[in-house]
Amino acid sequence: MAEAARDKGFEYLVISDHSKTAVYADGLPVDRVKEQWAEIDALNKDLAPFRIYKSIESDILSDGSLDYDDDILEGFDLVIASVHSNLNMDEEKATERLLTAIRNPHTTILGHPTGRLLLSRAGYPIDHKRIIDACAESNVVIELNANPYRLDIDWKWIPYAMEKGVQVSINPDAHSTGGIDDIQYGVLAARKGGLTASACWNANTMVL
C-alpha cells in the first residue's frame, strides 16, 4: 500500500485498520497494534521521505466511548472514530453518541458520520449542525469518505462545515491498492460542495 501510494505521487499514507471490536473485519487487538507500530517504524526508515502515519478506525461504542484504553489511543499519530455497530438509532441517540466521541480528546477525525451505504442503507439520522458545531469546538476533522458507496459526509453539509471552520478530510477508504484511486470520487463530491484546498485537511503536507 505504501509503495502504491508513493508511486501515485502521494507524500504519505495513513494506515487505519479496524479496531478490536470489529472482529468481523479482522480488527486489531492490542498486541497486533503494537506489532503494526513496529512495522511502520521500520518502513518509515526504508521509505523516507515518504511517511506512513499510525492510525486506527476506532469503533464508537453504544455509549460514545472508543474501544481502546487511553494509553493505546495516545500512541497513534491520529485516530478516526466511526460507528460500525448498533446502527438502528433515532436522531437524538445517534447524535449524542457521536458528540461523546467527538469530545474524546483522542479523536482526530469523525469517520463517515451517518454510516450510510448508497443504494443499500440510508444511514442513521443525525443533527448535522450539532455535530459540525461540536467538531468546531473540539477541533475535530470530519471525514468525507470517498468510497463511492459512502460519500459521507454528504456534500450538502460542506458549506456549513467551512462556515464553522471545520476541516474536511477526503479519505479513499482503501482496503487494497486499487482502492486508493477512489479518492477521485471524494474530490468530485467535495468540489460539488465547494470545498477549498485550505479547508481540506489532507490537501497539503501533513504535520502531526
Role assignments for model-derived ranges:
Residues 15, 56-57:
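Core AdoMet radical
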Residues 1-51, 62-208:
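Charged catalytic cores and adjacent phosphate/nucleic-acid-binding surfaces used
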